[in-house]
Design a protein with these regions (language model features):
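N-terminal amphipathic alpha-helix/helix-capping segment at the start of soluble metabolic enzymes
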Residues: 1-34, 140
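Short, well-ordered coil/turn segments that N-cap beta-strands
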Residues: 28-31, 58-60, 85-91, 108-110
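Hydrophobic, well-structured modules enriched for small/aliphatic residues and gly/pro motifs
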Residues: 92-102, 109-129
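Single conserved hydrophobic/aromatic residue that forms the stacking wall/gate
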Residues: 133-143
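Glycine-rich, proline-tolerant flexible connector loops at the mouths of alpha/beta enzymes
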Residues: 38, 59-80, 116-125
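Active-site mouth loops of central-metabolism enzymes
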Residues: 29-46, 91-97
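N-terminal active-site wall of soluble small-molecule enzyme domains
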Residues: 66-108
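Generic structural signal for hydrophobic
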Residues: 47, 51-54, 78, 104-105
């Protein structure tokens, strides 16, 4: 049966629950609104301001791209600014091509989202996968 045959009587895919900071996603939890910033991650104030607007609009998770190691390192500044302003919303690092950025981000934010299709070197992807297991943070792998 398709999950979209009758839009007034839908069923959700069965998933396991995962904690992202204080938020539980998957399982029988409600669907949480999330969005991704468009500001340059190296522009801390612009990313913080955009994140605050998203949170105030109802986002429960804020995704921030971290395409480089420097971007990943700057996630600490972004997170610190948000926490100083009283915002505790979990942050998600969106990683695409840089395995080292994922390793850095995993030590800073509540979740790391990785698309393995963007990793050309399978060996590098396996290396990052093992390092994230030791950190015990949620990691989303998509293909």
């Amino acid at each position: 049966m398709s999950h979209f045959e009758n839009l007034s009587n839908y069923t959700r895919f069965k998933t396991i629950e995962v904690k992202v900071g204080p938020i539980a996603i998957g399982g029988k939890n409600p669907i949480h609104i999330q969005s991704m910033t468009t500001a340059n991650t190296m522009n801390t104030s612009a990313t913080v301001d955009e994140s605050i607007r998203m949170i105030d609009a109802g986002c429960k998770l804020v995704r921030i791209t971290a395409p480089s190691k420097k971007d990943a390192e700057n996630l600490a500044n972004i997170k610190n600014e948000l926490r100083l302003k009283g915002y505790k919303t979990p942050l998600v690092a969106d990683i695409h091509y840089t395995p080292n950025a994922a390793e850095i981000a995993a030590k800073i934010v509540e979740k790391v989202r990785i698309n393995p299709g963007n990793y050309a070197d399978k060996k590098k992807f396996e290396e990052i996968d093992l390092s994230l297991i030791h950190i015990s943070e949620p990691t989303r792998l998509t293909s």
